[in-house]
Amino acid sequence: MIIDLNTNNVLGKKFSTSTKKENIKQIESSSFLTFKQPTEWQERWYLSSNAKDIGTLYLMFALFSGLLGTAFSVLIRLELSGPGVQYIADNQLYNSIITAHAIMMIFFMVMPALIGGFGNFLLPLLVGGPDMAFPRLNNISFWLLVPSLLLFVFSATIENGAGTGWTLYPPLSGIQSHSGPSVDLAIFGLHLSGISSMLGAMNFITTILNMRSPGIRLHKLALFGWAVIITAVLLLLSLPVLAGGITMVLTDRNFNTSFFEVAGGGDPILFQHLFWFFGHPEVYILIIPGFGIISTVIAAGSGKNVFGYLGMVYAMMSIGVLGFLVWSHHMYTVGLDVDTRAYFTAATLIIAVPTGIKIFSWLATCYGGSLHLTPPMLFALGFVVLFTIGGLSGVVLANASLDVAFHDTYYVVAHFHYVLSMGAVFALFSGWYLWIPKLLGLSYDQFAAKVHFWILFIGVNLTFFPQHFLGLQLMPRRISDYPDAFYGWNLLSSIGSIISVVATWYFLTIIYKQLTEGKAVSRYPWLTPQLFSDTFQVLFTRNNSSLEWCLTSPPKPHAFASLPLQS
């Protein structure tokens, strides 16, 4: 259909109106065309180009995906609560549940929440810009995640599911081992998720480099802003490698290529190199935004500026660079040359240096400060303790000779859940409890939030600490049965999982009460007593010059009518 609004000519039918709006109304009412304008609600939430609304959508999506991923994890722990078959007789189904749990939590819970949710909501505020650099690109970045999630759900529920683990290693992901369409759907879902992340990363980088207000130099940017830009660079550099690897798996499965088929001259180890060249930066993509949040929260909760701001920035940069140089520590058992293993051991141990700088800087920020144990501060301190434990088990696994024994045991599961399930997730909750009054303009029950922290803290520790002992006894991961000797620690671990689910349910009740009974909050709800909460001097000295606290709660759709200036 051709509509020429200049000549008022629609498919040969002439109208006598002069203005564009009247023209469109007549076109809508003409018998051969039905076009319904979106309602205000649809336009705000489906067609949004506002960073705050898109950030809210990301957080809602992450909450839904997190509940799905938690449900899968409980199924795993219920099956492992005793030796023999408990609930899941089919090992392929068990492996499909493990794959679904990992992918839901990594790609659809942590990344959308930490990068998409907090990144979109806060970044324009932190740089003093009106919005993101590419608002409509921002919208498609979010809406690509919805079909991506649907593809993963379909892949888990049709035929035998994708029982490959999140790593998708061939030949297990090849056409002979997984003959149905499940793995293909999972690969398409990963492609969509990757495109979404790359578009978002380009948007974040452009926003930070081009939309800062005068006076907000890069060396004055809040640490969360630095965390987002470093994460975005990691995404841009690593995701294309994953896309290439899984596309080769796709063509091996469907077009008879032999990239990873030994019979045709391919090499499955090549896929492991490609996957982990993405996979190791990916774990830093998950945790670096958490570093930014924890720095902000500890500064606010201590009443001090962050100790060693520049050191924190360059530590994050170092972690990002080194993250690309250590991928083969996931592959010590594939037959690497001894010199290669020596290099990857040394490089992996070096990553502990910038990580240690960050941990000691957080402790130094707390030292001598007036600590306020608000819910976000509790989660931040919990993060520091648990992330340190996870880092120490990582130092053990970095050694090639030890990892040959620990590879694919529950020691590895315990290690990465301490840095993710208690690192990234505790950072997420810390950021949620710090900024959700700003986002919604409503207060929540602080006592209930502290109870949530303690239930979750006990639950996750009871779940994952015993897994270190199972790993030391060499219990293999991704296997649904085990000898009776492992029964005790597995039962404890499963009880901890149920406690974590109770904590998650309790968290949902806190959100419900906040939305139904929450009172309106001031610009800076964390200042006690709230006598001078609108005074700029107080806001800046109390919270490390973060601009978002100068705005109303919730901020207006376009926060800055004129550019803020920072001297």
Swiss-Prot record:
Crosslink position(s): 1'-histidyl-3'-tyrosine (His-Tyr): 280-284
Binding sites annotated in the UniProt record for Mg(2+): 407-408
Reactions accelerated catalytically: 4 Fe(II)-[cytochrome c] + O2 + 8 H(+)(in) = 4 Fe(III)-[cytochrome c] + 2 H2O + 4 H(+)(out)
Domain of life the protein comes from: Eukaryota
Gene3D superfamilies membership: Cytochrome c oxidase-like, subunit I domain
EC number, as in UniProt: 7.1.1.9
Record-linked SUPFAM superfamilies: Cytochrome c oxidase subunit I-like
Keyword annotations from UniProtKB, A to Z: Calcium, Copper, Electron transport, Heme, Iron, Magnesium, Membrane, Metal-binding, Mitochondrion, Mitochondrion inner membrane, Respiratory chain, Translocase, Transmembrane, Transmembrane helix, Transport
Residues that, per the record, bind Ca(2+): 79, 84
Residues given in the record as Cu cation binding sites: 280, 329-330
Membrane-traversing stretches: 56-76, 103-123, 139-159, 185-205, 221-241, 274-294, 306-326, 344-364, 377-397, 416-436, 451-471, 491-511
Membrane topology type: Multi-pass membrane protein
Binding site for O2: 284
Residues that bind Fe(II)-heme a: 101, 417
Role played: Component of the cytochrome c oxidase, the last enzyme in the mitochondrial electron transport chain which drives oxidative phosphorylation. The respiratory chain contains 3 multisubunit complexes succinate dehydrogenase (complex II, CII), ubiquinol-cytochrome c oxidoreductase (cytochrome b-c1 complex, complex III, CIII) and cytochrome c oxidase (complex IV, CIV), that cooperate to transfer electrons derived from NADH and succinate to molecular oxygen, creating an electrochemical gradient over the inner membrane that drives transmembrane transport and the ATP synthase.
Name of the protein in its database record: Cytochrome c oxidase subunit 1
